Amino acid sequence: DHKRVLEGDKGANTGGMGAYSPSRLINPVLEEKILNKIIKPTINALKEMGSNYKGFLYAGLMIIDSEPYLIEYNVRMGDPECQTILPKLKTDLLEIIQACCRGKLENLEIEWYDKKSLCVVLCSKGYPERYDNEVLIENAEKFNLDENDFIYHAGTKKIGNKIYSNGGRVINFVSLSSNFKESRDKIFNHINKLDWSGGFFRKDIGYKVIDE
């Protein structure tokens, strides 16, 4: 994901201004290194400790000279990584969670859509510092989305029939496509339909994988 608030990956750190999947860095060789160097040893250590942990295990990695290094673990999904990845999931998420809880994941074939996914986060002006809440967002419910487009409310609240901002990161726009540029263009088209003077977003999410 893109952590910095400003375009070009500059400015203050945030919870995440957007993300894309798949990563430009991943390949079969690196994936094997991550599994053998980090994931499998972690799972084996949990077993040795007698831990019966079942759930998400989110590894925050840094790749240096094609070698993976573990920065942190979280027992949750990332935000906005979750919004970016889950729309690519063809298998019902509930089936996966149930199989995990019952210890039967090895019997479940998890399938994914072969598409690119891009997420752009619309934020309150001033984020990640001071910002105003309860700023009216016009047209927030007037989208005609196709099956590959998704809108996730985060820092919003509904008063009557109107939607207002209620946090720093406010709305996530996600689009699946055969290429990242098409996903980005569809997202921009949706954002431009909003009437919200109190918001901003990074226009360069995915710039490292989008060939203009």
Name each region found by the language model:
Residues 1-2, 59-63, 68-77, 155:
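Short beta-strand elements
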Residues 1-38, 75-88:
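ATP-dependent carboxylate/phosphate-activation module, predominantly the ATP-grasp catalytic core
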Residues 6-8, 107-109, 156-163:
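Short beta-strand/turn micro-motifs at beta-sheet edges
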Residues 32-57, 74-146, 159:
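Active-site "cap" helix and flanking loop/linker of ATP-utilizing ligase/carboxylase catalytic domains
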Residues 51-65, 203:
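A short glycine-rich, hydrophobically flanked beta-strand micro-motif that places a catalytic Asp/Glu
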Residues 58-60, 69-70, 119-121, 172:
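Structured core elements
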Residues 156-160, 164-212:
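Generic C-terminus detector
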